[in-house]
């Protein structure tokens, strides 16, 4: 006997939902069944064919036998029994369709097949000759089996019965889809809450780092302010010292006169602090191409190499290198007439550098 129990396989696709083999496609009853409309891939095709077969069989039996109660054919009993049990199995499992794990497209195919079957069942109930057989079949089933009236009544009210089930099935599938959608939204909400929590943790960590950076920046600002205060004090001190010295170099003064003016204007204490003792330049090496002067300070020993001093292309090197001193010498060396004036210029640059003038 065939039944629909195989439909409970949740992973089965709609194309595999029909477990029956349709071997009766050559049934000839064009006034009742249109085979072109009833596709063999339809979910209810097997049941529909059996539904048709039983009516044809009963109709034929009624025409050829005056009393069904006296002569009960074994094939009739078997066919009726199989039909009723198959029908009840459909009814028992039809609501399980809504619990299948199938796609939205597959659900729509099931609904379409279901509604098509309802229309086909309704055709039977609309035919007067089928109505005339209803009581005879009911009596026959009551004679053969106990408690079958409910199945028969259901069988012959298939249009309204199945229509209710179609709506129930749609409702259940809709509820299931809404539940799935709700669950997806809930999972999405949990994921978003997790991300928010991670962002909050990251924000707190960054906030802590920002606070630490703010403290460091504030400390650096305080240190910078202290240094600025020291620099400002030093600048004010040097401005005051420069006012005390107040040297006015006239453009007419030569190097020797400027050096003398410097030495006269610098106080003895300032001289000792800033320029050591204004030690004279010493010639430590004298060649045809260059002369090396040496100047001793409290901090280091400075050497000045003067090359090409008898030409217009005088070149001077300082060791250790002092940018300010060399810049001042190169700026004024063209004014010097001989090596003597160059030596005074070097000493003048040294004094001015040490005095920050």
From Swiss-Prot:
Possible candidate for an effective malaria vaccine as determined by epitope response in sera. Keywords: Coiled coil, Merozoite. Residues 166-244 form a coiled coil. This is Uncharacterized protein PF3D7_1446700.
């Amino acid at each position: 006997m065939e039944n629909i129990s195989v439909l409970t396989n949740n992973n089965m696709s709609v194309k595999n939902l029909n477990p029956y083999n349709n071997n009766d496609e050559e049934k000839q009853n064009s006034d009742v069944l249109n085979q072109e409309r009833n596709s063999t891939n339809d979910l209810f095709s097997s049941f529909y064919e059996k539904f048709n077969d039983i009516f044809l069989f009963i109709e034929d039996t009624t025409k050829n036998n005056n009393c069904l109660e006296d002569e009960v054919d074994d094939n009739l009993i078997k066919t009726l029994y199989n039909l009723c049990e198959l029908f009840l199995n459909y009814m028992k499992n039809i609501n399980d369709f809504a619990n299948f794990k199938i796609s939205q497209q597959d659900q729509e195919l099931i609904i379409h097949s279901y509604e098509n079957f309802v229309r086909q069942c309704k055709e039977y109930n609309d035919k007067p000759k089928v109505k005339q057989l209803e009581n005879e079949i009911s009596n026959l089933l009551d004679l053969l089996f106990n408690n079958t009236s409910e199945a028969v009544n259901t069988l012959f009210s298939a249009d309204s019965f199945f229509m209710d089930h179609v709506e129930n099935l749609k409702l259940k599938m809709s509820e299931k889809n809404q539940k799935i959608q709700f669950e997806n939204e809930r999972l999405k909400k949990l994921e978003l809450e997790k991300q928010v929590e991670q962002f909050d943790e990251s924000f707190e960590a960054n906030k802590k780092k920002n606070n630490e950076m703010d403290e460091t920046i504030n400390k650096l600002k305080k240190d910078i302010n202290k240094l600025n205060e020291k620099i400002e004090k030093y600048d004010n001190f040097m401005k005051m010292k420069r006012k005390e010295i107040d040297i006015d170099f006239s453009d007419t003064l030569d190097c020797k006169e400027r050096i003398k003016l410097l030495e006269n204007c610098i106080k003895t204490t300032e001289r000792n602090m800033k320029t050591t003792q204004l030690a004279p330049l010493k010639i430590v090496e004298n060649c045809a191409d260059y002369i090396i002067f040496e100047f001793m300070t409290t901090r280091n020993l400075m050497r000045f190499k003067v090359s090409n001093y008898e030409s217009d292309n005088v070149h001077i090197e300082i060791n250790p290198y002092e940018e300010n001193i060399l810049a001042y010498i190169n700026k004024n060396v063209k004014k010097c007439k001989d090596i003597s004036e160059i030596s005074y210029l070097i000493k003048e640059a040294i004094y001015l550098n040490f005095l920050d003038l």
